[in-house]
Design a protein with these regions (language model features):
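Anionic-ligand binding patches
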Residues: 2-5, 11-31, 35-135
Length: 135
């Protein structure tokens, strides 16, 4: 049975990926299934969602030697030239959703309601030892 490590600690995301991969015969593990010492600190310092997903996937593959699926996602607000973008989770500091929403609303002050458009972007990367990444 092929195995895949999903680079997430989010139980909801883990359920979603299991629903996709398990019916196709994959054994799915997530970061929740690993010992804490198996999960390296990962600095997602890329300049794009895809680059951050690749950084995360490679870091985990190098430690676990497993096939890894990683994603990076965020909110891209058109009136803010795509911000918060790759900085969505830490837009106002360290993973503070309330502060992030407050900062976003402050940044949108004066922007008419019909110009407050946005999209949620996700980039997914799969890496396998000795193979080129799939982006």
């Amino acid at each position: 049975m092929p195995k895949i490590l999903i680079a997430t600690k989010n139980p909801g995301k883990a359920r979603e990926y299991r629903k996709i991969f398990e019916p196709k015969g994959f054994e799915v593990t997530t970061l929740l299934d690993l010992d804490a010492d198996q999960v390296p600190a990962i600095d997602e310092n890329g300049s794009s969602f895809a680059e951050n997903a690749l950084i995360k996937a490679n870091a985990l593959m190098n430690v676990t030697h497993a096939t890894v699926l990683a994603d990076d996602s965020g909110l891209c607000v058109d009136a803010l030239d795509g911000a918060p973008g790759i900085h969505s989770a830490r837009y106002a500091g360290d993973h503070d959703d309330v502060a992030n929403r407050k900062k976003l609303l402050e940044a949108l002050e004066g922007v008419p309601a019909d110009k407050r458009t946005a999209h949620f972007h996700t980039s997914i990367v799969v890496v396998h030892p000795d193979k080129a990444p799939l982006e």
